[in-house]
Amino acid sequence: MISVCIATYNGEKYIGEQLASILKQLEANDEVIISDDGSTDATLSIINGFQDVRIKVVSGPQKHSPTLNFENVLHHAQGDYIFLSDQDDVWKTNKVATCMKWLQKYDCVICNAEVTDEHLNILFPSLFKLLHVSKNKIYNALWKNGYTGCCMAFTRCVKDAALPFPKDIPMYDIWIGNVAAFTYSVKFIDDRLISFRRHPATNSCNGKGSKFSKWQQIRFRWNIIKNILKNKIGKNSFLWKRK
């Protein structure tokens, strides 16, 4: 069973297109869990208009925090495989099938994406190249985050290990990515499986660099490492890897 987890807030402009691109790739027993953080536009009306029993909407934390909203939606996910999704992208038709193939060998898969404008015109053909993504887990932990949430799919064991989120992390994807990298197995794949839409209301990364100071980034990364080292994600799990 697959759980697609979406955190929404005032996403009426693009949520319909995104849901349509996702639902046609899922089986009847899969689910789309949506945590809505108090949208005041037509987001919920559009979602309800699909009348699809695979869609389940839960109330978000009402704090307008993507990290808290994603934590909430993950708590409700029942699937053996978890796919994270932003509310404004579009999935390529082979995203689920491609990721599922790799998830038979690895616990977490991070796919590439093409970066587009709001009309899906390609701005950058490769998100990995735009963000200078490294596949080295030490580099990702200590220097620059290589994990983009909407590109991530992982097994239930990664979800269970990552929850609950520590309170002192900058963003949900850097935490989940490092949990997966240091306790399970991660695979970066070059397949561009998402149209990663950039527009004025975008919350996620845009390739322009971090909004945090270097000192803040160092503190955030220390918090990530500290939470892993103190075994927050399970007894002896830092020393254990699935063979």
Locate each region found by the language model.
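Conserved nucleotide-sugar donor-binding catalytic segment
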Residues: 75, 135-209
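A conserved acidic beta->alpha catalytic loop
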Residues: 21, 36-45, 63
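Short aromatic/hydrophobic "clamp" motif used to bind/position activated sugar donors
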Residues: 82
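Short, well-formed alpha-helical segments that are part of the catalytic scaffolds
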Residues: 11-24
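Conserved donor NDP-sugar-binding/catalytic core segment of glycosyltransferases
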Residues: 96-123
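Short beta-strand/loop segment that forms part of the nucleotide-sugar
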Residues: 29-38, 58-60
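Acidic helix N-cap motif at the loop->helix transition within catalytic regions
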Residues: 14-16, 39-49, 94
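Glycine-rich, basic loop-to-helix element that forms the pyrophosphate-binding segment
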Residues: 60-77
